Amino acid sequence: FGSFIPCAHKGEPCTICCRPLRCHEEKTPTCV
């Protein structure tokens, strides 16, 4: 029903990272 999955921006917790970011796991997974 037109639900938009928000993407995670740089420095935000990894869910679905906005392109071209990718998940980087150190202490806490964040998008980089």
Curated annotation (Swiss-Prot):
GO CC annotation: extracellular region
Tissue expression pattern: Expressed by the venom duct.
4-hydroxyproline found at: P6, P13, P20, P29
Disulfide bonds: C7-C18, C14-C23, C17-C31
Keywords: Disulfide bond, Hydroxylation, Knottin, Neurotoxin, Secreted, Toxin
Cellular localisation: Secreted
Tree of life domain: Eukaryota
GO molecular function annotation: toxin activity
Stated role: Intraperitoneal injection into fish (0.5 nmol) provokes vertical suspension and paralysis after 6 minutes.
Record remark on domains: The presence of a 'disulfide through disulfide knot' structurally defines this protein as a knottin.
Protein name: Conotoxin pr6b
Annotated source species: Conus parius (Cone snail)
